[in-house]
Swiss-Prot record:
This is UPF0434 protein Arad_4458. Gene3D superfamilies: 2.20.25.10. It comes from Rhizobium rhizogenes (strain K84 / ATCC BAA-868) (Agrobacterium radiobacter). Transmembrane segments: none annotated. It comes from the Bacteria. InterPro entries: Trm112-like (IPR005651).
Amino acid sequence: MDVTVSKVDTKLLDLLVCPLTKGSLSYDREKNELVSEKARLAYPIRDGIPIMLISEARRIED
């Protein structure tokens, strides 16, 4: 499934924050994830819905 960020999704991205750090997120189009650089976590997007649960996040390795 190819998911692209639309105008509405961009507004949503501006509102969403990392649930752990409350910091901003960036969108990784290649992996279809929202990334928190501060927490070193990547939150998956499934069927166009960001899964903002720490337990579902992937830890980003160096």
